[in-house]
Amino acid sequence: WFNRTSENGVSFYNPYESWTYSTKTLPMYNTKTPYTELAYFGTIFANAQKESDNLHILTTQNIFTELNFTSENDRFGGDGIMQSEKNTNKSIVTSFNYLGKRYMMHTGYIHNKVIRKENGGTSDNSMVRDTTLDAREYPINLNNASTDLIRNTFFLDQQYRIPFTFIRNIKDRKIDKAFKDSLLASGDTARIDSLDVFLARRRAAREAADTLGDNNITTAFIGHSSEYSVFRKTYADQITDAAGKAFYNDVFNYNPTTSFDSVRVMKLENRVFLRLQPWSDDAIVSKLNGGIGNR
């Protein structure tokens, strides 16, 4: 837990990253037929004060062979163990991805909202040791406090593949020329008469070949990646009782009964990169990368 890494680099949002998606973890789909998931799971037989309920809705389909659309809605919620621990975590995701022979693109929108009640812990630690008490009976420091977190992310990743087919074409022309020269030198008139047809078939086969999966050709990739994210956290409370005032050492600089604090982080990233694959993708030197960006 303490060694976890942050996808977004926003400290107050780190604990919630595993409950939603990032631009790196958002799954992209490619389906032959429309696909939908509906799921509900929770502790339906638990006490109503402590039950949790979770909802998952996913739908995805290919608009065209290369273009896919996906929408997902997730909700995680629970009332907690002690008083004022109710928590709701909602995520809404919309994404498109395009997978062509030369061009590839991923784009989407990620929305995450967390509404969390705050109790400040129990005001009497000795009651925790009393096993006859239910956790709901523990006195708490804050009776009317909450924290809201909202995150909105727009992202676009795209790249264009440029296979250096001219190198292979030069090799193929040399092979064709060598075959033609050897055949002419043999003097076989029947095979010489069909030479043009044979070479035409070879050229047609090469032109019709799908180079998307050809990993053994020198290739360049030009790509662009961008992300715009806004993270906002707000804390609000109303404190009129002695326990709540003691929790904050009775220090209220602006309002003696009400607090409202907020923080906002905006992240804008743009990156352009160039990747060169000199030989095959599993060679000793498989990729050479370079790029620039701003954040």
Predicted segments with their positions:
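Short loop/turn motifs that connect adjacent beta-strands in outer-membrane beta-barrel proteins
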Residues: L26-T33, T65-E66, R102, P163-I222, ...
